[in-house]
Amino acid sequence: NESTMEANMDAAFNYLKNIDSESEEMPAVAQSKGTSLYCLENTMEAKAQQLGFTTKVVVKAKYTPYGLNENSSYFSWKGNYYTLDQLKTEYLKHSDGSGLKVDLPIFLKKAGIMTQEQFDGDQDTKNSVVASLSEGATATQLNAKTGIIGRFCAVRYYHESVCYYDVLIRHDQNVTEKMALGRYGVVRNNWYHLELQSVSGPGTPWIPDPSDPDNP
């Protein structure tokens, strides 16, 4: 049975998945310090060394851009970062049918905060939803699930500065050429040690899982 085989392979590889609704539980990203994990061997052709095929580690961390309060929630849009109040102010600067007046409603609808009826309504309806945005635990408020459910949009929401980074596992450190055979992968009877020394910017507010529509 092909579907059973696929389910067994998914379980064996144990990859993290995003959620699509408020009713789903947040995926646990946790590992005790100093412990190790076993994973299946995973090698591929050079041209196949991409996010959807390469074994990696997902790092959950908090990154707050300069100028914002540490561990606070914020939005990103076109390379800029905003608190909720700043985003509302920026939103009002844009003409109807352009900029944030387009991108923010798209994000809010994807995240489940704006209903389809509100999204299809007039500009005043959308403006009202934006004006009433707040943080909280309900489905229509900004919370820990919002950024994950509303993934792949121009507007991103980082709840309490939480973000995710994916770190591809390098098999051969001596292979310096990008996409060269053996650069990435997991080979049996090998021990891999990953050390994260620094980050230069926020990751994604969603878990970078194999369904991401991006190459490395």
Model-derived segments and their meaning:
Residues 183, 188, 210-216:
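C-terminal functional modules
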Residues 200-207:
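Substrate-binding/catalytic groove segments of enzymes
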Residues 1-198:
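Tryptophan-paired
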